[in-house]
C-alpha cells in the first residue's frame, strides 16, 4: 500500500472505533515501489496500532524444489517482515534448473529449452526483465508457428470501451425497461453480439468476460454490470488456453501462476531489495517446473534441494523480430474524431498494413488509413530502426 491508502485506512479507523482491520500482504512481493508502495505502512500496523502479526507459511501452489529455491533467495532480502520459511504442501518434488550462460543473447536458448520440454497440456510462461525481451520472444514464437500471447498491463484501458462490449451494451439498452436485466434480454444481447462480431478474434475473450459476470451475479443489475466493466482488468480474463505460451515481464506476471516458468535474467541486478523482490516474484509464479537462464553469478552460491545447475557455453544469435503492442499513448487520438463509421466496420483480427505514419486496412476500393502513430511512438520506431528493426508489412 502507498501513503494515501494508509492515510485512508487511518481515517476510517479514527471514525469507526469498533471497526476491525485485517491487513493481508507479502512484503517479499512488494515490487511497486516506483508507484509509492512501501512495506513500512504494513509494518506500522504492528508498531503504531498494536496489531498482531500472523505468518501464512503453507504454500499450495508450488512444488518442493521451487519453494526451496524461493526460500533461499528470499533470505537475501534485507528488509523483511516474514521470519519463517515457506512450506510446500505439494507432494511433487518438481523440477528446477539453473542454467548459466556466457553470452548476453539468451533468448534463443530459452526458446529452445521451452520447445524441447514436455509441457503438453500445461500452462507455460516465459518471464523477462524488459518489454523488448518479451516482445522479441513472443515474435519469434509466433513466427515459428507457436501460439504466443504477450501479457500486457493495459493501463488506462477500460473494458467498457471494447467495441464488442459497447455493442452488447447498446443492444441491452435498446430494450431495457427496468434496472434489472432479464435472462431473456441478456441472452438476446449475447446472440446479437455473436452474430455481429462472429469474425472478431476478440469475441471469445468478450464472451468470457460476460460469462464471468453472469456466474457471479444472482440478479443482473445494469448499474452493477457497468461497474464490473469499468473496474475489471482485461488481463484478468486471459484463460490459460491449451497450447498457448504466455510471455510477460516479471512485473506484469504478478498475481498469476503457471505450471511451467522459463525465466530470462540478462545481467539481473540484485544490488537492492527492490531488485531482489522482483526476482522472487518471478520464482514464485512457477507451480511444477522452473528453468532460469542467467549470465551472472546471482545463483552460484545457492545450494538448494532439487535444483540442477547447468553451464551453457554455446553462443546464440540475436533475435531479429519483436511484437510491439500499441496503446492509447502510441496513437494520435484526434485522428479518430471523424472515423466512427469506419471504426464500427472494423473487426479484431483484420490484417493491418504498416506505413511510416500509421496503419492502413485493405478495402474493396484499395487501402484506407485507420490510425496514425503518436509523436512519441514514432520516436520509438526510429529507435528500433537504429537497432536494425523495421516494421513487417
Say what each PLM segment does.
Residues 5, 38, 106-110, 246, ...:
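Amphipathic coiled-coil/heptad-repeat helices and related helical stalk/stem segments
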Residues 300-393:
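Conserved active-site motif detector
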Residues 3-94, 98:
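Conserved RecA-like helicase ATPase core segment
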Residues 38-42, 275-279, 374:
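Amphipathic alpha-helical segments in well-structured domains
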Residues 64, 123-278, 283-291, 296, ...:
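Core RecA-like ATPase module of SF1/SF2 helicases and allied nucleic-acid translocases
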Residues 19, 121-124:
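Short coil/turn segments at beta-strand junctions that form active-site/ligand-binding loops
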Residues 102-121:
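Conserved interdomain hinge at the start of the Helicase C-terminal
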Residues 17, 27, 152-157, 268, ...:
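Short, acidic/turn-prone active-site loops that include or flank metal/cofactor-
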